[in-house]
């Protein structure tokens, strides 16, 4: 499933979008997702906390036994935030930990993201 955000949105809108994404994924048995957030140059701590603490655990439960695999396509500015902001880095390190019951990887190249999601097309 490919989801692209073309602008910033309030947390409530993003939460509704994620709920819709999860509903579509459940209905169609989709556990490999590409999230394109290249047009965003910032992310709120509130959103990072919500996806980490609420959404990923919920998605993991609802998609089981399939494993959620999410390639996140970032802008260079957003990648810099993830690396330089200690609060954001905490959330990023948590979700990238291979011990989690889901797989998330960050990319700045869409081709690389698709190859990670679908190695058979690589």
Please report, for each region that a protein language model flagged, where it lies by residue.
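Amphipathic, Lys/Arg-enriched alpha-helical "gate/interface" segment within cytosolic domains
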Residues: 1-122
């Amino acid at each position: 499933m490919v989801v692209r955000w073309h602008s910033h949105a309030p947390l409530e809108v993003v939460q509704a979008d994620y709920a819709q994404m999860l509903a579509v994924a459940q209905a169609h048995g989709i556990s490999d997702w590409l999230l394109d957030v290249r047009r965003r140059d910032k992310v709120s701590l509130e959103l990072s906390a919500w996806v980490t603490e609420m959404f990923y655990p919920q998605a993991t439960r609802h998609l089981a036994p399939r494993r959620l695999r999410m390639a996140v396509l970032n802008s260079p500015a957003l990648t810099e935030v993830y690396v330089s902001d200690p609060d954001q880095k905490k959330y990023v390190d948590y979700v990238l930990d291979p011990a989690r019951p889901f797989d998330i990887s960050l990319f700045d190249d869409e081709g690389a993201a698709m190859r990670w999601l679908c190695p058979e097309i690589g």
